[in-house]
Amino acid sequence: MKEPIRVLQVLGTTGLGGAESRVMDLYRNIDRERVQFDFAVHTSKKGYFDEEIEALGGHIYRLPRFQVYNWIPYRAAWRSFLKEHSEYACVHGHMTSTASIYLPEAKRAKIALTAAHARSAGTEGGVKGMMTKWMRKNLWKKTDVCL
């Protein structure tokens, strides 16, 4: 039997948040013999959906959490991860604040399709908010699809 297409879902956690719940709704209802989801999360903590993801055949990979001061190591972690995991047909990013880093790395790794999925209505104030706005700027130029 043909191996399923693998899609990497990029999230902050596998907790009970809105994006995580919507992705899990999709995951439960797709034909997993044809498409499989794996998850890249930015926490070392176990998430609410971890056991279910693994039971459905998905893998969970833990990458470092982005901080302004770790831009280069964060990008290097993604570059290394994607070099080791060339099985993905798509990287679907739900974290638009850092998508301008990891989606270009996915393109660099020859991932066929990259998608940025923004659900956020805004940004915080202060330095973090300014950084988020700057990183989101021109995101549509760095990915195949912006939703």
Model-predicted segments: where are they?
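Membrane-interface segments of envelope glycosyltransferases acting on lipid-linked substrates or membrane lipids
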Residues: 1-147
